[in-house]
Amino acid sequence: MTDVVIVSAARTAVGKFGGSLAKIPAPELGAVVIKAALERAGVKPEQVSEVIMGQVLTAGSGQNPARQAAIKAGLPAMVPAMTINKVCGSGLKAVMLAANAIMAGDAEIVVAGGQENMSAAPHVLPGSRDGFRMGDAKLVDTMIVDGLWDVYNQYHMGITAENVAKEYGITREAQDEFAVGSQNKAEAAQKAGKFDEEIVPVLIPQRKGDPVAFKTDEFVRQGATLDSMSGLKPAFDKAGTVTAANASGLNDGAAAVVVMSAAKAKELGLTPLATIKSYANAGVDPKVMGMGPVPASKRALSRAEWTPQDLDLMEINEAFAAQALAVHQQMGWDTSKVNVNGGAIAIGHPIGASGCRILVTLLHEMKRRDAKKGLASLCIGGGMGVALAVERK
């Protein structure tokens, strides 16, 4: 089987909801990382076979946002592009599809990743095309209905986290402690400059003067403490345990990697960041969608012929502290090797981009530590999981 490698990885800093990136459309964020990933790899735009980008909230974004991002990044019109939506797994699924295309001989070099601007998701007015004869009409928030709502049980993703907390005995205290840990790790990583290499600046136009370079994750809480979190009320169930502080945020950002065969990398004289060892997808009950990483990770590890104990480093997305803790409980891996620089609770969760964002962070930290075996995994709204294993020589 063809060995598939990742030769470069880049992401934007993650913006908070209504923050620095709020006015930058998702395709423009995608263009920034596509261009940066190619430049870092030393690959020319015309050498690219295809661009695959995840984006969940596409209402009002225009035709095929991935194609828009590719064109804005300077790729020639002859290079095709595809937008995919696998909710929170979109950015990682894009990388899997890139690997598929290369292994099948359909492509030589693929740029894959994800982009999202949750701040810009529009409200829509269902039924308005035919008009309203009388009575009130209701605006629907596409961010919630298309990104955060369990269509099968008609409740918010937060309720699925409450379900996990009850089923696996995850207490409020444990969730808050986990969230504080994520924030503290991310704050320390920021101060140590650990994200600097993976982040490409986004130029934010100003009303007057030169654009401002946005290059620092702005959702991270400085000086987070258990006391500051423990007083918050539950966000989804009055008698529940999930709060705004022990859940991930609503965020904006993008990430991309350049994928090719090991033979192509050798031909071009490129040193891979890692080889894609295996990947897997899985389904679970939508009521406990946060458990998706368990079967997906087990499947990916089995295909790689690894055990959880073989892993040197992991990025396991923190949609909610409750589900992250339950996943760690079920997998039995060394949690000191998981999200060592904080996770989505601190950094943020721009849903279409997060799959690739955690992969980018994983690859850069593996390089820093000279780690050999890594795993990226996410839960997915609707009851699924994705996981991808990478190896450095």
Curated annotation (Swiss-Prot):
GO biological process annotation, one example: poly-hydroxybutyrate biosynthetic process
Pathways involved: Biopolymer metabolism; poly-(R)-3-hydroxybutanoate biosynthesis
Catalyzed reaction equations: 2 acetyl-CoA = acetoacetyl-CoA + CoA
Signal peptide stretch: none
Main location (coarse class): cytoplasm
Stated consequence of mutating F219Y: 2-fold increase of acetoacetyl-CoA thiolase activity
Gene3D superfamilies given in the database record: 3.40.47.10
Result after altering C379S: Almost complete loss of acetoacetyl-CoA thiolase activity
Keywords recorded for this protein, A-Z: Acyltransferase, Cytoplasm, PHB biosynthesis, Transferase
Keyword Cytoplasm among record annotations: yes
Presence of keyword Ribosomal protein: no
Enzyme type, top EC level: transferase
pH dependence: Optimum pH is 7.8 for the condensation reaction and 8.1 for the reverse cleavage reaction.
Subunit structure: Homotetramer.
Name of the molecule in the record: Acetyl-CoA acetyltransferase
Species assigned in the record: Cupriavidus necator (strain ATCC 17699 / DSM 428 / KCTC 22496 / NCIMB 10442 / H16 / Stanier 337) (Ralstonia eutropha)
Lineage: Bacteria, Pseudomonadati, Pseudomonadota, Betaproteobacteria, Burkholderiales
